[in-house]
């Protein structure tokens, strides 16, 4: 997939880049797999902001993605490759032999006309096939990985993402995640073979603030530009430093302080992220 540039008829477009849509084959989405999801805008049920710098972004419909891959033993033909406004990778429309249609995340090297399947075991190691992790050979590159059997894929779902199966230990398998973290996952969980497609997304330059607004991201104001009542870094005459250790708006030290709470799943993490 090629990166395209734009003529610099404005200053913001000079450094703006995008992805070509040559790989997209569908002219329209399947209506039965589209659903409206109201935007939360970062507010809770009381209307208060609980997650800052969020907005609705461009108007879009949600595509129902099959993250569970539990349709065992029925082959599916890739009917189309589509754009999904809700994620940074492409999605593939599968047409199953029994007539049902489903969307999945498109892995690299999965093209229109390919036939894939999902099963507990016994499938070829090729992009798009899904099996229980305990039945996948050690060393295989996988994505769309479940953390709990039957819950649906939660790991390695974004563009260019993948994990590697490093070994087995009793009822668990050992995975190296995209962050570099090594952790155990139950062997009964499902995973899909291959690397998530559209890996060139990481090289895109948005170029202007407006493209961030389309994605639902609002501007972020520096604490030092606020008043003392609004932020611990606020106030002072002229351009003044924080005068203390940099903190969040609520006084929590930032720039490196670990804030992750202890969880029951800590015992499954063998080593934390790279350089963390």
From Swiss-Prot:
| Any one GO molecular-function label of the UniProt entry | structural constituent of ribosome
Q: Can you tell which superkingdom this protein's organism belongs to?
A: Bacteria
One GO process term, biological-process aspect? cytoplasmic translation
Biased-composition ranges, Basic residues, are 257-276
This chain belongs to which protein, by name? Large ribosomal subunit protein uL2
InterPro entries listed in its UniProt record: NA-bd_OB-fold (IPR012340), Rib_uL2_dom2 (IPR014722), Ribosomal_uL2 (IPR002171), Ribosomal_uL2_bac/org-type (IPR005880), Ribosomal_uL2_C (IPR022669), Ribosomal_uL2_CS (IPR022671), Ribosomal_uL2_dom3 (IPR014726), Ribosomal_uL2_RNA-bd_dom (IPR022666)
The segment annotated Disordered runs over 219-276
- Species source reads Campylobacter hominis (strain ATCC BAA-381 / DSM 21671 / CCUG 45161 / LMG 19568 / NCTC 13146 / CH001A)
């Amino acid at each position: 997939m090629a990166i395209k540039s734009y003529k610099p008829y404005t200053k913001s477009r000079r450094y703006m880049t995008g992805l070509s849509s040559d790989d997209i084959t569908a002219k329209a989405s399947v209506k039965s797999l589209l659903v409206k999801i109201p935007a939360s805008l970062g507010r809770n049920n009381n209307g208060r902001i609980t997650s800052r710098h969020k907005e609705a972004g461009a108007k879009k419909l949600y595509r129902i993605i099959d993250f569970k891959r539990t349709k065992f033993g029925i082959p599916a033909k890739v009917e189309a490759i589509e754009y999904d406004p809700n994620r940074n990778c492409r999605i593939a429309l599968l047409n199953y032999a029994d007539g049902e249609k489903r969307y999945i995340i498109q892995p690299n090297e999965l093209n229109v006309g390919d036939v894939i399947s999902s099963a507990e075991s016994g499938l070829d190691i090729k992009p798009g096939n899904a099996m229980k992790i305990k039945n996948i050979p050690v060393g295989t590159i996988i994505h769309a990985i479940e953390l709990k059997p039957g819950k649906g894929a939660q790991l390695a779902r974004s563009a260019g993402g993948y994990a590697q199966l490093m070994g087995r230990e009793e009822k668990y398998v050992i995975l190296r995640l995209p962050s570099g973290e090594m952790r155990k996952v139950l062997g009964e969980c499902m995973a899909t073979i291959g690397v998530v497609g559209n890996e060139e997304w990481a090289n895109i330059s948005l170029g202007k603030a407006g493209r961030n607004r389309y994605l639902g991201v609002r501007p972020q104001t520096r604490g030092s530009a606020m008043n003392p009542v609004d932020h611990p870094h606020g106030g002072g005459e002229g351009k003044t430093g924080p005068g203390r250790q940099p903190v969040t708006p609520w006084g929590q030290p930032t720039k490196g302080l670990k804030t992750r709470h202890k969880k029951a799943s800590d015992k499954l993490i063998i080593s934390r992220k790279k350089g963390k």
